[in-house]
């Protein structure tokens, strides 16, 4: 069975397996320990439980191993049977462990836009200078009140669909004010502008900030006149762009490449890239956990805000 104590001694192998370095993995496991204890106790004390506390089979995996199992699944999207071979467990047991652990993982991470599962309390050591941990869009806007540029984009992920094809690849609206990601899942064939409206991102942006987008966001300036909207110029029907307009589009693309890099970081976790084969009601949960992992890496590897 994979042993955490051995893998953390090989930083490159650990980062290749789960996307975190040993320090980030250890801190996250320590943060998850009390969350798992509380969730397990709540389950034991639930109404209708007949067996006494302590009875029954004990869990085979502790919190660090359960975290490693979940992160490997998010990173590589391996079949449950293969994960069962790696951790010497039945595939059904692997599935139960992962799906029970995902909500706690999202709660422990700086994940976006799912306020009902986020713990946004600011906790700092007694001997340290108080610091702000950026977990929500409001935290980012409060810490960076001078934010001037917001870049929005969309991405898709294929998933199963019924025979009548009422739905298909889910499109995600991705906003990037500093290092915070925001998501809104929709059905197949939905235009980028409609996704942006459904995400409810625009009313929450700082007044006077600039909004950057691709040609799919042409017309956003009519929705938010208090913002400066910058999108590439579209070629007129039957016409051509002038050299000045082509150069302007090139400069806009150099700014917009930032959000493309963010999408690339998200898609390194195969659960957000490959064919989605889980319950559609958990789609946002998976994306929230992955976005939280990307945020965690970004925050921990950037200067802290005092």
Q: Predicted regions: what is each one?
A:
Residues 1, 40, 54-56, 65-66, ...:
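Short, flexible segments with low predicted structural confidence
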Residues 1-61, 302-303:
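Charged, often Cys/His-bearing segments associated with DNA-binding zinc-finger transcription factors
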Residues 30, 34-41, 75-79, 100-103, ...:
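Short helix-loop boundary/capping segments at the starts of domains
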Residues 62-77:
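Short, amphipathic alpha-helical "recognition" segments used to contact nucleic acids or chromatin
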Residues 80-306:
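Short, well-ordered secondary-structure "scaffold" segments embedded in the functional core
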């Amino acid at each position: 069975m994979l042993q955490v104590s051995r893998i953390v001694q090989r930083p490159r192998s650990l980062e290749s397996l789960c996307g975190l370095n040993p320090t980030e993995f250890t801190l996250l496991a320590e943060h998850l320990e009390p969350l798992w204890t509380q969730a397990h106790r709540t389950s034991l004390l639930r109404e209708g439980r007949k067996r006494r506390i302590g009875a029954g089979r004990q869990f085979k995996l502790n919190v660090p191993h359960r975290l490693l199992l979940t992160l490997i699944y998010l990173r590589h999207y391996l079949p449950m049977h293969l994960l069962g071979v790696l951790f010497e467990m039945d595939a059904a047991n692997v599935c139960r462990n992962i799906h029970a652990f995902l909500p706690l993982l999202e709660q422990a991470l700086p994940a976006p836009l799912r306020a009902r599962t986020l713990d946004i309390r600011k906790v700092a050591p007694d001997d340290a200078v108080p610091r702000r941990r950026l977990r929500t869009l409001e935290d980012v806007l409060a810490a960076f009140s001078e934010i001037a540029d917001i870049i929005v984009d969309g991405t898709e992920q294929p998933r199963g669909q019924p025979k009548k094809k009422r739905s298909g690849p889910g499109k995600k609206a991705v906003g990037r004010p500093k290092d915070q990601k925001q998501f809104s899942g929709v059905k197949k064939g939905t235009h980028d502008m409609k996704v942006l409206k459904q995400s409810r991102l625009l009313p929450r942006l700082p007044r006077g900030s600039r909004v950057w987008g691709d040609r799919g966001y042409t017309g956003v300036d009519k929705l938010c006149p208090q913002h400066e909207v910058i999108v590439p110029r579209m070629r007129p029907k039957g016409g051509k762009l002038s050299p000045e307009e082509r150069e302007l589009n090139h400069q806009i693309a150099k700014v917009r490449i930032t959000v493309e890099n963010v999408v690339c970081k998200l898609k390194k976790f195969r659960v957000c890239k490959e064919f989605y084969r889980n319950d559609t009601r958990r789609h946002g949960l998976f994306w929230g956990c992955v976005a939280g992992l990307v945020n965690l890496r970004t925050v921990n590897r950037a200067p802290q805000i005092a």
